[in-house]
């Protein structure tokens, strides 16, 4: 069984008789000799969707929950619900906008490589690919000869995400964005 220090963002764990999805992990290192490192986890109850914040000691044993990943594509929006379609058996998976708000910044109609995490038959989270291609809708005009310098400018994507891009990038171009660091990687 893994220790608290081995748990990663996006894991499903069992705690106090409930299954939680780990959304965020913060490492807390208290000052002083006797202070043990703590891992503060922001989790969501799979059954109810309620938020819970728990702290675990580094060597505390945590039980991983059984979960599966299914490949899916974004299908459509129905009010406040976002529907994703299973790539193999076309099962629809519905998510509330608030539950996947951060992930929506990287999802466009043609985003490939999306994974749905399923615990006990219930879709609990979306796992994004490491990089996605998005189109720029708003940025300052490109500067000729700017490829020689490493200066950047803000650019807004079709999804609303804003990242820093090199000065030579123009509106309408597709760029590759790193989903974990929220950074420009290259032209698509």
From Swiss-Prot:
Example GO biological process: peptide biosynthetic process
Name the InterPro entries for this protein: Elong-fact-P_C, NA-bd_OB-fold, Rib_uL2_dom2, Transl_elong_fac_P/YeiP, Transl_elong_KOW-like, Transl_elong_p-like_YeiP, Transl_elong_P/YeiP_cen, Transl_elong_P/YeiP_CS
What the entry lists under CDD domains is as follows: S1_EF-P_repeat_2 (cd05794)
| Xref: SMART domains | EFP, Elong-fact-P_C
Pfam short name (any one): EFP_N
The record's GO molecular-function terms, alphabetically, read: translation elongation factor activity
Q: Where is the signal peptide?
A: none
Entry GO CC: cytoplasm
Task: Give the family, as the similarity comment puts it.
Answer: Belongs to the elongation factor P family.
Could you tell me which PANTHER family the record lists for this protein?
ELONGATION FACTOR P (PTHR30053), TRANSLATION ELONGATION FACTOR KOW-LIKE DOMAIN-CONTAINING PROTEIN (PTHR30053:SF14)
Q: Could you tell me what this protein is called?
A: Elongation factor P-like protein
Name the species this protein comes from: Aliivibrio salmonicida (strain LFI1238) (Vibrio salmonicida (strain LFI1238))
